[in-house]
Amino acid sequence: MRVAFVFPGQGAQEVGMGRALAGQYPEARAVFDAVDRALAADPVPLSTLCFEGPAEALTLTANTQPAILATSVACLAALRARLPSLAPAVLAGHSLGEYSALVASGALPLDVAARLLRLRGTAMQEAVPPGVGAMAAVIGLDDDVVVGLCEEAARETGRVVQAANFNCPGQVVAAGHADAVARLRERVAERGGKSMPVQVSAPFHCALMEPAAARLDAALAAISPSPLDVSVVANVDGAPYGDASRVRELLVRQVAGAVRWSDCVRAMLEAGVDTFVELGPGRVLAGLIKRVQRGARVHSVSDPASLDAAVAALSEAP
């Protein structure tokens, strides 16, 4: 068995996430406590937002990003408590989930990652005024077709619209100015594809995020990542980091660049991975992975029951 640990991104959050694991596993509780200390200036502890809400506060990007990190790393801590000998061959995360992967790899301390994600979330939210940007999921068209339609819509409107997430075959999320995204959706319909708006607070992973990338770059300049204990596959190119010297570059590029999740999954499969463990709220990545590789073995861990199921399956696997 060759295992990959994968970590979700924004959109997976829900009130109550991590609460049951933290109540049952001291190792998980310690993760939330550490993130609360890292963000000690918060008027309400981040763990309280995760466990109790309100949803309006949890879904603010500046809170969502460190909250999903905390929950994902808490799930990892609980899994390690149950199966300390289970060693992943490779790690990856979707968008902000890449920070969770870097924590799991030993490259970033948890407290540093939490503060970086607070800054990242704040900067991404502030990069574009409310209502100016939009995102839309395009279904049923090949990646290169969607890229071409984005280019057409951008030329026709003189505005920004780009492929932002290559999630799985037949699903690409685009981001940019709201009017350019609307034009893209018209072009998608003309080509026989479907599209739907993605309810987000800003157009992530497109050129409109360049101001946020610059702010993150300044923060990362002051950080010296540790060597990676486990390989991490980067979102921006679907290739392993290689070494910690690229952490700053790759995380900065990721803010305004596309998340190439399909390529990340293919890279892990090509590295011999036959089992994926999704650590964090929801099961979004499990669905995407199975669309990249039909029949892929994926175990999602988000609460004590799903942890029990994953431990049982992983313990029985050859």
What spans do the regions from the language model cover?
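Alpha/beta catalytic cores of group-transfer enzymes, especially the acyltransferase/condensing modules
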Residues: 11-12, 37-42, 105-257
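Non-catalytic positions within long, well-ordered alpha-helices that form the structural scaffold/packing
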Residues: 269-272
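Short hydrophobic/charged patches on amphipathic alpha-helices used for structural packing
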Residues: 262-266
